[in-house]
């Protein structure tokens, strides 16, 4: 009877661990990505040739970041941050979004 009694706490611990892992997995699935909680652009380019750009996304200031961010997706799939104050970037935004 002693072996069954000692395996009960071990089984209970395993069940609790499994429950915690499942709960943590569900929480992680709905949690925002860390980079959404801060500015995404740490460095910016002053411009890039329009023919290399597939799309442009402009993010206005908000609780996650106090700056306007311009993120261009290149035709290669790479994302680059552009300086929203640069004259060339203003022209790119105007052509891509209007």
Curated annotation (Swiss-Prot):
Q: Name one GO cellular component term.
A: extracellular space
What InterPro entries does this protein map onto?
A: Chemokine_b/g/d, Chemokine_CXC, Chemokine_CXC_CS, Chemokine_IL8-like_dom, CXC_Chemokine_domain, Interleukin_8-like_sf
* Record-annotated disulphide pairs: 39-65, 41-81
Signal peptide (UniProt feature, chain positions): 1-29
- GO molecular function (one): growth factor activity
Where in or outside the cell is it found?
A: Secreted
Q: Which UniProt keywords apply?
A: Cytokine, Disulfide bond, Growth factor, Inflammatory response, Secreted, Signal
Q: Does the keyword Disulfide bond apply?
A: yes
**Principal localisation:** secreted
* GO BP annotation list: immune response; inflammatory response
By sequence similarity, the record places it as follows:
Belongs to the intercrine alpha (chemokine CxC) family.
The record ties this protein, via PANTHER family, to: GROWTH-REGULATED ALPHA PROTEIN (PTHR12015:SF192), SMALL INDUCIBLE CYTOKINE A (PTHR12015)
Give the protein's recorded name: Growth-regulated protein homolog gamma
Can you name the source organism? Answer: Bos taurus (Bovine)
